[in-house]
Amino acid sequence: MGVYRFTCRFYTECLGMKLLRKRDIPEERYTNAFLGYGPEDSHFVVELTYNYGVESYDIGTGFGHFGIAVDDVAKTVDLIKAKGGTVTREPGPVKGGKSVIAFIEDPDGYKFELIERGPTPEPLCQVMLRVGDLDRAISFYEKAFGMELLRNRDNPEYKYTIAMMGYGPEDKNAVLELTYNYGVKEYDKGNAYAQIAISTDDVYKTAEVIRLNGGQITREPGPLPGINTKITACTDPDGWKTVFVDNIDFLKELEE
């Protein structure tokens, strides 16, 4: 994230999120802001990070978008335009499907897909990442992370296939959308998008399962210095990073 205040205002005024909490770590020279549509202990949220003095980042070609479910895509797009936001795809049906969508960008260039959908407990509903081998990615997320394949769809006309992975139905939970573009085996990940965070009852057991299923542990399980929240981190076969956070420790962190 480049300009901290401007970006936070976009998320609250254009996307209707709430600033849930923020923390400044001057000794490490960064600031975090956590934004979403409900409390962190029960909702998927966005963590924005501002590194002191860094004004821009390279998003790369691998990260796709975040998905937000809204009642009326056209109305939301009008609001975003009125606030000075960037619309990169006007409202209309998705390629190869019937769902009404639009695409917008935040001030740092992150894309958001607005998805027309009825009332949902989880408006921040998707993260889309591109992968080089869809079958391999599906197998990894099923076996290493315990996700289920909710659905997949092949679009030969547009030369791509998607797979929706998650821990529950799409209309009630945030899901991971994996996209395979025909013939593309790898992507530039840039230096902007960092990771997804998932809660777990035991970071040590989680790390074992990930190792057994071909994941690379990039941070051994254990407490974080200073806050004592236990975490572990890994990368999937495509190099996408995920952090697993101890459930009880995380709830204690929110209480402080």
Residue map of PLM features:
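Extracellular structured ligand-interaction cores
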Residues: N32, F63, L124-Q126, I162, ...
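Active-site acidic/histidine proton-transfer and metal-coordination neighborhood
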Residues: D108, E113, R117
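Vicinal oxygen chelate
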Residues: G2-F6, E40-H43, Y50-D108, G132-D135, ...
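A short, polar/charged loop-to-alpha-helix boundary motif
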Residues: G118-Q126, D249-E256
